[in-house]
Amino acid sequence: MATDYTVGDLVAEFLSACGVTTVFGIASVHNIPMLDAIGRRNSIRFMMARGELGGAHMADGYARVSQGLGVIFSSTGPGAANAIGGLFEARFAGSPVLHITGQTSTRYADRAMGSVHDPYDQLGMMGSVCKGAYRVRSAQNALGVLTQAAVEALSAPMGPVSVEVPIDLQRVKIERPAVLDNFVLPLAAPRVPTDAELDELAARVVAARRPLLWLGNGAKQAGGAAAKLLDMG
C-alpha cells in the first residue's frame, strides 16, 4: 500500500503521543525531515535555540517544570557534541530528557569515509554522559528504539537518553504503526511500600531525637507527601 508516512512522521507522532508539546534545538541538514514532520503536524512547538548547549538546558528546564519528557533536537557530530554540557546537567539533576540527533547516512556511518559531520563513535560520546545512547538501524525498529529511550529517560533514576536517527532513514516511507492510535509508554508502576515497611519507618521517626528527612531524585513526585510529613512535626 502506498504511503507518504515517513520515519520522520513517526518521530513527530511518537512525541505527541508521549504528551510532548514543545521541543528545543537547532535545525540542520541532518534533522530537517524530522522537524518538517513536526511542522506538518502542528501539534508541537519547535523552539529554536542559539546553540545546542542552550537547547539542552531548555529541554532540561522543560522537563523539570512539566514533570514530563524534555526533548532536544541536534545535528550530528559537532552539533551533538555541543549538547553534552546540558545533557550532563540533566543527568546530574535527574531530568528525563530525550536527545534526538541526526546521523550521517547508514552506508557511511562508522566507516570513517569523511562524510559530512561523520563523528567518530558518536554513540560512545553520548553514552558517556547519558543513561543510554541508541541508534535507529532500520525503519522497522524506529518505534521500538524511541519507546525504549523514552521509557529509560522517565524511569528512576531519571535522566537523559540519546537517540541517533540516520538522515536516510528519516525519509524512508513506512506504514503508520496502528499502535499509535492509543499509545501509552510502558512505564513500570512505582513500587508501593507495604504496611509493615511504613510501620517500621514511622517507628524510627518517632524514636529519633532529631530526625532528618533526606529526599533524592526518587522522591520528585512525592512533594505533597513530604510536606505533609514535615507538617506533622
Model-derived regions, located:
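N-terminal alpha/beta PP-like core and its mobile active-site loop of ThDP/TPP-dependent enzymes
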Residues: M1-G233
